[in-house]
Amino acid sequence: MNSTAANVKPEPGLYGPDAAASPAIARYLIQGPSPLSIGLVVLIGAISSFLLQQFLKPAVNPLSPKFTSNTWPWLGSLGMMIGHWTFWKSCIKESKTGQFSFWLGRTHVVGLSGPDARKMFFEHPALDLHKATDLTPLGVNFWPIHAIFTPRDEKFQKSTYWLRTLTHLMKTPNMERCLPGVIQDARTGLEALKRDTPSGIINTPKVWPVVFKQTARVFMADDVTDDPKLWATTLGAIDTILHTFSPFNTLLPWIPEPSMIRRRMARRALLRVSRGIVRDRHASPKSASKNDAVQSLINLGDPDDNISEFMINAAFVGVVNAHVIFPQLLNALAVHLDWQDKVYKEVTEVADQHCKEQCLPLVDKLFHIPLSAWENSFPNAALMMEEISRIWTCFPTARFNTLYESIPIPGTSEVIPARTHAIYNSTEIHFNPKLYDRPASFRPDRFAPESQKTWDKEPHGLNTWGTGQRLCSGMRWAKLQQNILMAVALSLYRLEKCDKDGKPDPSAYEKQQAMDGDLDEEVAFVLPECFVKLIPRE
């Protein structure tokens, strides 16, 4: 034995019977652990339990469709968030039934495909749209779901404040009230394009503020559209919500991710605007005579909180598709000059029919067109809008099974489990060659009255304006808006397709015949650049 080691003695008071001689240990033995150390242990334990809960997947119904292999650890199916159509096709390819399961974070989702499952998805009354908004990156800004989306009676899903108010604002007197203002909004915004861009070369997705100003006038208040300060705040907030995205908003919503923080702040800014307007209206005796959307709801005696929430939700929902459709209509009109000429001819004929002062510029004549003519006198514009909507409304749509029991998936032995999300991708129908001849081609005449409705070969073969249990409640305004925007644009300009330098784009027509080249967004929630040259009309 090493003699040096053998001669080493333990330090008194630290080991053995002399341990109590250490003052620190003695205090610990007598007093117990400090509150700080207990707190740290509890905090670490709580964080560990929370993380464990977040990363462990809950049990699922064994009759659920088989899970896809396209899955990342912890995150789930990231492909669904960054390339939805590529992901969808790969999942269907490896599924024996065409149905599949996948994870978004800890959320179990059932993916559906095929005519029978599609019919069930769109028609089953227990599959709720609003309760599935936590699943979509655009919907999480408005979570938890406000009471305006809750039915007064579970048996009548359409008995919500949201739908009742939309129906009220879609009535003819309200549409007629808004008509002069929204025509002027379109004129002011589109005339400014040439003033702000002397070359006349515009990137069409950048014109969306014109679309939003009209939407704000219809669903919010004249204060928003007419007050520069309120307009700037509201426009900036909507811009953030529309164009700020991260897949983690849905996959790991508990992480304070920067884009989520910006979106939450934007939503709060919208609430401050809407609540401030409602508060000011109550404070001013003269407000009762105002004639806009918010005042009509106040005059009906609606609760202030409901009005404020409706304003910001309607402003967002009203622009989310419209700000995509109009830029693509401008592009299509610039590429297909034959269709541009058809729509322009409609505009001039309708304007001349309703305006007695023939010496006025065409854009001034538009103010004389009555609501009924705006809605019914532009058949070629309607065909273009339907075709653009078919092409550009290709995305996953979510529902939530509100039942505490499973819903069988027709034609399979599989189910959508109780309290579980389901998703259907409308790209499956809108680019289906069985339903549409040459679906990747821009062909508005496929929707002409004399054409065969090939999409009726299968249930719900067209989903441009909703279908089944969920039709677009704001469809009347949406169609009217696009007619007005096209008419004002063509009354001011002739449109020519070009590149970013203003040179003619020789491949533009070919691109319009192969619009299925990439059905996944290049950048999520950001439209690809699309340049058009504005040539002022004489």
Curated annotation (Swiss-Prot):
One of the protein's GO biological processes: sterol metabolic process
Pfam families with a match to the protein in the record: p450
Keyword annotations from UniProtKB, A to Z: Glycoprotein, Heme, Iron, Membrane, Metal-binding, Monooxygenase, Oxidoreductase, Transmembrane, Transmembrane helix
Cofactor dependence: heme
Enzyme nomenclature, EC number: 1.14.13.-
Catalytic activity line of the entry: 2 nataloe emodin + reduced [NADPH--hemoprotein reductase] + O2 = cladofulvin + oxidized [NADPH--hemoprotein reductase] + 2 H2O + H(+)
CDD domains per record: cytochrome_P450
Pathway in which this enzyme or protein is active: Pigment biosynthesis
Location of this chain's protein in the cell: Membrane
Residues that hold heme according to the record: 472
Induction field: Expression is positively regulated by the transcriptional regulator wor1. Expression is down-regulated during biotrophic growth within tomato leaves. The expression is induced at later stages of infection when conidiophores emerge from the plant and produce conidia.
Molecular function terms from GO: heme binding; iron ion binding; monooxygenase activity; oxidoreductase activity, acting on paired donors, with incorporation or reduction of molecular oxygen
Glycosylation sites: 306, 425
Membrane topology annotation: Single-pass membrane protein
Chief location category: membrane
Domain of life: Eukaryota
Membrane-crossing residue ranges in chain numbering: 36-56
Enzyme class, first EC level, given as a word: oxidoreductase
GO CC aspect terms: membrane
Family classification: Belongs to the cytochrome P450 family.
Functional summary from the UniProt entry: Cytochrome P450 monooxygenase; part of the gene cluster that mediates the biosynthesis of the bianthraquinone cladofulvin, a conidial pigment not required for virulence but that plays a role in fitness and resistance to environmental stresses including UV light and low-temperature stress. The pathway begins with the synthesis of atrochrysone thioester by the polyketide synthase (PKS) claG. The atrochrysone carboxyl ACP thioesterase claF then breaks the thioester bond and releases the atrochrysone carboxylic acid from claG.
Name of this chain's protein: Cytochrome P450 monooxygenase claM
Lineage summary: Eukaryota, Fungi, Dikarya, Ascomycota, Pezizomycotina
